[in-house]
């Protein structure tokens, strides 16, 4: 990932409809045409003087200067007709993908303006349709129309344009409420609040505040010089089955009938379900007849495992594990895999078990064994000695391998470094150490081992971030505790804008985020730029759970805001 260069960045904004451009007719909201005309009346979206001086077309707008030497110019392409996102299907998403393909050479990035109700589905589907992306595709929308006095649409759309225009993040993303998510990791979690989306099992790719923080190691790398491939042959006959206590086997049998070709089955907890013989038999028969069933947990966070007998029974019935995929991503992936021609049933199941577009987090053992054992490669490299060439190879490769082991939670590989007396404070190009990576990923066992072996608890990467700050942002409470016990403290620079961050978390009702900052030693009474503190923001927003939490932290009482 790199910051986009050049004096002008040209984007295509594809307006499909959605609440952001809706108008009231007869007391209800309906899709509204002419979004470009609305945006031209808002100075934050258009610099008319620059447009006239450069003779820009009527449908092309230009943002005010994002930096002294760069302009973002964007063309608004309005779909005919506009859609309520509840009516969107694979057919419409194929049209969006093909529109991106037709204009791919003309623009450096794309923004898709979409209704929020099915935006997570759209982002997941597009991520599989668009292979070998070299440019950002950012979906966004709003909970309230953009022309309303109090709307989230302005910040969301402006943020999406800036992220697509200023950064080269070659993925299908979703930007909402100051956060850039990987699209196929998102789900809509609130029907009314502005913080409508979350990414349950992957931190945001970027967070916007006083500064823009990019989680560089999470951003997927572009596939070299490969050309964009658009997969428009998606299988529509896939479905979603949510298990519930006492679900009859007869109902499951009826649901699994043709023309259905694939099913995402939402199970309990870590992939568990009823073990009644008649129900398991229906699932087994369907799988033997060629129906592909993917097991996803209906929990918001966590993953499917085989820790319990009922989970093992599901795997024994021929069901494919969806690991930590969202149901939206699993449906999209199933549609994509079933749409690929010439594959056997076994080949399709293998594809479903692979991480194709960053949609799932595979267990560490699966990651390491996909292309061979990482530990064996490290041991071979560490055993090389005697030549200048070997030493050069070690200097180049060892930091990356150490960070890869920390990322995967691979204690055995890291132990190989220790046994051969290698430095575990190796840094990569961005100043990251294995402790940074393990802290961000939440690998408590790896953090423990690294601390015991002398890892620098106060190491800073090139952005001035400590392992403790990364653990806080990942909300990894066990790791925060380990680092604090080892003497880690947040620096004054890391706490400089903490008041604003705490107020943002309080406004969103994010108790887990607030608890992480408190555990790391932050003063939860720190005010934001307006002089308000998190408790006051939570009270004003009516977030009773957050108010109770903040009041339980005895050192988090704040004074009244100072008058302006």
Swiss-Prot record:
Query: Which positions does the record annotate as the modified residue Phosphoserine?
Result: 478
Entry keyword annotation includes Nucleotide-binding: no
Which residue intervals make up region (Asparaginase)? 41-350
Write out the ranges of the repeats annotated as ANK: 141-170, 396-426, 430-459, 463-492, 530-559
Enzymatic reactions: a 1-acyl-sn-glycero-3-phosphocholine + H2O = sn-glycerol 3-phosphocholine + a fatty acid + H(+); L-asparagine + H2O = L-aspartate + NH4(+); a 1-O-alkyl-2-acetyl-sn-glycero-3-phosphocholine + H2O = a 1-O-alkyl-sn-glycero-3-phosphocholine + acetate + H(+); 1-hexadecanoyl-sn-glycero-3-phosphocholine + H2O = sn-glycerol 3-phosphocholine + hexadecanoate + H(+)
The keyword Ligase is assigned to this record = no
Q: Which UniProt keywords apply?
A: Acyltransferase, ANK repeat, Hydrolase, Lipid degradation, Lipid metabolism, Phosphoprotein, Repeat, Transferase
Q: Which GO terms describe its biological process?
A: aspartate family amino acid metabolic process; lipid catabolic process
Residues that hold substrate according to the record: 84-86, 116-117
Name the residues annotated as catalytic in the UniProt entry. 19
Domain Asparaginase/glutaminase, chain residue ranges per copy: 9-355
Q: Name one GO molecular function term.
A: asparaginase activity
Q: What is its EC number?
A: 3.1.1.5, 3.5.1.1, 3.1.1.47
Known function: Exhibits lysophospholipase, transacylase, PAF acetylhydrolase and asparaginase activities. Can catalyze three types of transacylation reactions: (1) acyl transfer from 1-acyl-sn-glycero-3-phosphocholine (1-acyl-GPC) to the sn-1(3) positions of glycerol and 2-acylglycerol (sn-1 to -1(3) transfer), (2) acyl transfer from 1-acyl-GPC to the sn-2 positions of 1-acyl-GPC, 1-acyl-sn-glycero-3-phosphoethanolamine (1-acyl-GPE), and other lysophospholipids (sn-1 to -2 transfer) and (3) acyl transfer from 2-acyl-GPC to the sn-1 position of 2-acyl-GPC and 2-acyl-GPE (sn-2 to -1 transfer).
- Give the similarity note: In the N-terminal section; belongs to the asparaginase 1 family.
Self-association and partners: Monomer.
Provide the protein name. Answer: 60 kDa lysophospholipase
Q: Which organism is it from?
A: Mus musculus (Mouse)
Q: Which gene encodes it?
A: Aspg
């Amino acid at each position: 990932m790199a910051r986009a260069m050049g004096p002008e960045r040209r984007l295509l904004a594809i307006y499909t409809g959605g609440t952001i451009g809706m108008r009231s007719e007869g007391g209800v909201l309906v899709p509204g045409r002419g979004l470009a005309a609305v945006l031209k009346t808002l100075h934050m979206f258009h610099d008319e003087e620059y447009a006239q001086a450069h003779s820009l077309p009527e449908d092309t707008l230009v943002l005010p200067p994002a930096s002294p030497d760069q302009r973002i110019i964007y063309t608004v392409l309005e779909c005919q007709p506009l859609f309520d996102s509840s009516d969107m299907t694979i057919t419409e998403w194929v049209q969006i993908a093909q529109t991106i393909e037709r204009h791919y050479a003309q623009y450096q990035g794309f923004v898709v303006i979409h209704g929020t109700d099915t935006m997570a589905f759209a982002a997941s589907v597009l991520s599989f349709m668009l292979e070998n992306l070299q440019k950002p595709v950012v979906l966004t929308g709003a909970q309230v129309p953009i022309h309303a006095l109090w709307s989230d649409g302005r910040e969301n759309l402006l943020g999406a344009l800036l992220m697509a225009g200023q950064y080269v993040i070659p993925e299908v993303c979703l930007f909402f409420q100051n956060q850039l998510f990987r699209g196929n990791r998102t789900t809509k979690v609130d029907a009314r609040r502005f913080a409508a989306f979350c990414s349950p099992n992957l931190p945001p790719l970027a967070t916007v505040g006083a500064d823009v923080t990019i989680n560089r190691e999470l951003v997927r790398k572009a596939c070299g010089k490969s050309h964009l491939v658009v997969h428009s042959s998606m299988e529509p006959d896939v479905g979603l089955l949510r298990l519930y206590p006492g679900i009859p086997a007869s109902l499951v049998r009826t649901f699994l009938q043709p023309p259905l070709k694939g099913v995402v089955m939402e199970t309990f907890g870590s992939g568990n379900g009823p073990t009644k013989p008649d129900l398991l038999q229906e699932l087994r028969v369907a799988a033997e007849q060629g129906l592909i069933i993917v097991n996803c947990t209906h929990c918001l966070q966590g993953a499917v495992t085989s820790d319990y007998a009922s989970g093992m029974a599901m795997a024994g019935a021929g069901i494919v594990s969806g690991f930590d995929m969202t149901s939206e991503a699993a449906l999209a992936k199933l549609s994509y895999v079933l749409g690929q021609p010439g594959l056997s049933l076994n080949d399709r199941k293998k594809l479903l078990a692979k991480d194709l577009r960053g949609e799932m987090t595979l267990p560490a053992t699966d990651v390491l064994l996909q292309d061979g054992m990482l530990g064996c490669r490290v041991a071979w490299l560490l055993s090389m000695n005697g030549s200048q060439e070997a030493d050069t190879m070690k200097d180049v490769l060892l930091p990356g391998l150490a960070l890869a082991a920390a990322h995967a939670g691979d204690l055995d590989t890291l132990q190989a470094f220790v046994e051969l007396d290698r430095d575990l404070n190796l840094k990569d190009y961005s100043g990251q150490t294995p402790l940074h990576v393990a802290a961000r990923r939440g690998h408590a066992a790896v953090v423990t081992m690294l601390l015991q072996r002398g890892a620098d608890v106060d190491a800073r990467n090139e952005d001035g971030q400590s392992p403790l700050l990364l653990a806080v942002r990942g909300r990894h409470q066990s790791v925060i505790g380990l680092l604090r016990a080892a003497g880690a403290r947040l620096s004054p620079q890391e706490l400089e804008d903490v008041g604003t961050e705490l107020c943002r978390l309080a406004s969103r009702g994010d108790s887990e985020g607030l608890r992480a900052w408190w555990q790391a030693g932050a003063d939860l009474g720190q005010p934001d730029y307006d002089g308000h503190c998190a408790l006051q923001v939570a009270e004003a927003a009516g977030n009773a759970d957050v108010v109770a939490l903040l009041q339980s932290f005895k050192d988090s009482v704040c004074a009244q805001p100072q008058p302006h």
